[in-house]
Amino acid sequence: MADLKDILLDKLREARAGVVASLDGLGEYDARRPITATGTNLLGLVKHLVGVEHVYLGESFGRTPPDVLPWVADGSIWQNADMWATADESREHLLALYERAWAHSDATVAALDLDAPGSVPHWPAERRATTLGFLLVRMVEETGHHAGHADICRELIDGRSRSGNDEFGADWWREYVATVQRAADAFGPGSS
């Protein structure tokens, strides 16, 4: 049986791959435009996860991240500057930052035991003390959460999903959506 740390790291790697795969084949506009009412966009998810990896699996264990992130250094992270790509931030640049953050995080996980103590600098003082195990689970959760966002955003852009929805074909999906809509309509305006 695999070691728990290995299992968690494998799940983190799967979630990271899902986030990155959501960008496959998209032009710059679709990679960065807001898809939801709150501005969620694919490159913004990547950019956000760079910073989260830096803090949770780097700084929290006294390990200096490989890059200085301008949106962290200038404090604009607190105005959501980590959730969208500026015109000066290319896809290649943000993906390279993410890959370096992965390598740094993976090295932290390899170097420490799951019960190694850490401290998250921006958490309230009474909750700041934590462990690698807790933050690794948190990172799997955070990345999986945003991989789901990325999957939905991609589906809204061009109908593609990493969940394999292409195998059924457009006609099947139209009928399926119509079936789901009919079920919902039974509870729509005027229903009892």
Task: Show the residue positions of the predicted features.
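Short, helix-capping/interhelical loops that line the mouth of catalytic, cofactor-
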Residues: M1-I7, V52-T108, D115-V120, L156-S192
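Conserved catalytic core of Hanks-type protein kinase domains
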Residues: G25, H48-L49, A111, R138-M139, ...
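Helix-loop segments that flank and shape redox-cofactor active sites
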Residues: A17-N41, E59, R63-W71, N80, ...
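Extended alpha-helical regions
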Residues: K5, L9, E14-S22, D30, ...
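Alpha-helical transition-metal enzyme core signature, strongest for iron centers
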Residues: L12-V19, L42-L57, W84, D88-R91, ...
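Generic helix-packing signal
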Residues: I35, V109, D151-R154
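A contiguous, mid-protein "functional segment" used to position or interact
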Residues: T130-D171
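Short, solvent-exposed segments of well-ordered alpha helices
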Residues: D3-D6, D10, T36, T40, ...
